[in-house]
């Protein structure tokens, strides 16, 4: 049988083209099925190990040692960061001699490390000391600090050509006017501010990609339903996440992001709750323009599966 299949694949006969295509498809399908059978449930490097029956973390306290360990795999930051940086470099043309990057909410330091490895001067800042400690241990050669981004004196005036605020970090700032003022102060003229913004009425929760989600892609995509909650299973714990939107979103702009982790052995539970301040995109851009920023570019993040999410690139003109 294998000799017959090999003869089809290696044949130069044009009449065998269709057979070659069908055999190739069959091999791909078999490979997908094999991966599905072997690799589920999804594995995260560090397991869930919690001695207390119940732990509740809110806002800045969410990012402790546990979250630092699982953050990159849980939110798939590697592929997203790689794609985002490719867009930023394509649209702003930085150079390794003169460009200086600042990553706001630098988390585990992955973005800072990628830029540094590509020859750029780059600094990171995060409010979580646990995240900074994790980043320093993982990437000893990067420059990253724990500081308050709301403090205008955190960095000197006109220090950066690029300020990145990705991973929906901007929604953690209640006073966005202050945020934009600080960024404007820290940037040089003709510098760029990169924001990850979402259509708050249409965006989906970022879902961890499990291997069992691999499937044939139809030629005509069905209309997608909005996903604001997920239930997912990992090697050591069950994971649930959801966004809670108020009825009067236009008036309050306050959205809650909740996560729950349940140990599969002990049934111990950890709950995270984060308060997000989600003005609509137009209002956020208008606040930036009032400070002095101008629009430079916009990139749709649908290419990486994040529908109704965008990278906005703003410029400080002078």
Located regions from the model:
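Conserved class I S-adenosyl-L-methionine
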Residues: 21, 27, 32-96, 98-107, 110
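Class I SAM-dependent methyltransferase SAM/SAH-binding core
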Residues: 109-152
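A short SAM/SAH-binding and catalytic strip from SAM-dependent methyltransferases
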Residues: 161-175
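SAM-dependent methyltransferase
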Residues: 197-285
């Amino acid at each position: 049988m294998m000799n017959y299949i090999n003869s089809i694949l290696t044949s130069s006969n044009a009449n065998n083209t269709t057979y070659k295509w069908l055999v190739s498809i069959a091999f791909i399908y078999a490979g997908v099925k094999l991966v599905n059978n072997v690799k589920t449930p999804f594995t995260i490097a560090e397991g869930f190990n919690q001695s207390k029956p119940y732990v509740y973390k809110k806002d800045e306290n969410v990012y402790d040692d546990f979250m630092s360990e699982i953050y990159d795999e849980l939110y798939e930051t590697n592929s997203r960061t790689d794609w985002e940086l490719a867009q930023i470099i394509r649209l702003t043309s930085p150079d390794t001699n003169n460009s200086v990057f600042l990553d706001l909410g630098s988390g585990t330091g992955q973005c800072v490390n990628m830029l540094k490895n590509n020859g750029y001067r780059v600094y990171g800042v995060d409010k979580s000391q646990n995240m900074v400690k994790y980043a320093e241990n993982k990437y000893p050669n990067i420059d990253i600090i724990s500081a308050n981004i709301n403090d205008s004196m955190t960095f000197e005036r006109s220090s950066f050509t690029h300020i990145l605020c990705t991973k929906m970090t901007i929604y953690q700032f209640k006073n966005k006017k202050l945020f934009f003022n600080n960024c404007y102060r820290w940037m040089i003229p003709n510098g760029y501010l990169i924001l990850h913004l979402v259509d708050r009425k249409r965006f989906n929760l970022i879902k961890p990609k499990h291997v069992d989600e691999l499937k044939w892609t139809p030629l005509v995509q069905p209309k997608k339903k909005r996903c604001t909650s997920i239930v997912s299973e990992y090697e050591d714990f069950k994971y649930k996440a959801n966004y809670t939107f108020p009825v009067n979103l236009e008036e309050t702009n306050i959205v809650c992001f909740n996560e729950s982790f349940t140990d599969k052995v002990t049934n111990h539970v950890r709950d995270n709750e984060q308060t997000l301040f989600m003005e609509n995109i137009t209002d956020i851009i208008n606040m930036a323009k009032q400070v002095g920023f101008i629009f430079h570019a916009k990139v749709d993040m649908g290419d990486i599966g994040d529908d109704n999410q965008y990278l906005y690139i703003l410029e400080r003109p002078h």
